[in-house]
Amino acid sequence: MTKRWLTKENSIKYLNEAFYGHLATVSNNQPYLVPVNYVYQQNHLYIHSALQGQKIANIRENSRICFEISHPIQLLLGEKPCQFGMHYWSVLVFGQAHILDDFNLKTAALKLFIEKYSHKDNLSPMDPNDIENVAIIDITIENISGKANY
């Protein structure tokens, strides 16, 4: 087993490949962790959300976030309890989050979600009311690191 730090490029590669991650926010010194769908583009993560809720309230109070993705590859069984292990990769992101208010920026971010998650070429156009009724969290990445154990 070789543990190694991933390059920034490999960490970004995994960010582009993973389908969901875990967003950590804080309010009143209480951490809050939630699974989310996201897209990555040019040192930003975009997260689709309801307009209200704990994660939105936390971001409005404290914009500092941590975001995590990971993938187990293989469980390694040993003869003794301390010989067990796991082949995996993981990526951590630290940054500042804010809620997009601009209609055009929200639309552009939602198009990134469609590109990543939809396999249909003939989707109907986005309804402006739907765009207004969704929150897009924009995370500016300040630090990204990844680790793998293959």
Where are these regions (language model features)?
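Short Pro/Gly-enriched beta-strand edge/turn motifs at strand-loop
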Residues: 5, 17-20, 119-122
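Short beta-strand segments
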Residues: 17-51
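Extreme N-terminal tail/first-helix region
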Residues: 1-17
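A short mixed-secondary-structure module that forms the rim of ligand-binding clefts
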Residues: 39-74
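A generic structural signal for short beta-strands and their flanking turns/coil linkers
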Residues: 19-21, 34, 41-43, 61-65, ...
